[in-house]
Amino acid sequence: MTETFNPQANTVFCRKYQQELPKMPHPPFPNKKGQELQETVSEKAWKEWLEQQTMLINENHLSMLDPKAKQFLTEQRDKFLDNEDYERAQGWTPES
């Protein structure tokens, strides 16, 4: 049996950009939430979130061992991906 190329298998309807975009090659987490994110968030949106997350961690001196820091980042991630108002790093300005 030969596999046919299905371009939609490599795209997702991105919840941030509200359009079909290339999907992440792998789930970002090895759990159900990671699978859900891979199916609803584009690779572009995820890369942008990782940049934001890094700035938030650095600026706020967050420890990934602290459950409160993890919860904060989870909340900010969901807001970012849903185009809601989220806490931005103070030194960050959006590209125009």
From Swiss-Prot:
Region feature (Disordered): 21-40
Q: Where is the signal peptide?
A: none
Tell me the keywords, alphabetical order: Iron
Single annotated GO MF: iron ion binding
Gene3D superfamilies, per database record:
Fe(II) trafficking protein YggX
Q: Which domain of life is it from?
A: Bacteria
- Cellular component annotations (GO), alphabetically ordered: cytosol
Single GO biological process annotation from the record: cellular response to oxidative stress
The record's family statement is: Belongs to the Fe(2+)-trafficking protein family.
Q: Any idea what job this protein has?
A: Could be a mediator in iron transactions between iron acquisition and iron-requiring processes, such as synthesis and/or repair of Fe-S clusters in biosynthetic enzymes.
Stated name of the protein: Probable Fe(2+)-trafficking protein
The record lists the organism as: Psychrobacter cryohalolentis (strain ATCC BAA-1226 / DSM 17306 / VKM B-2378 / K5)
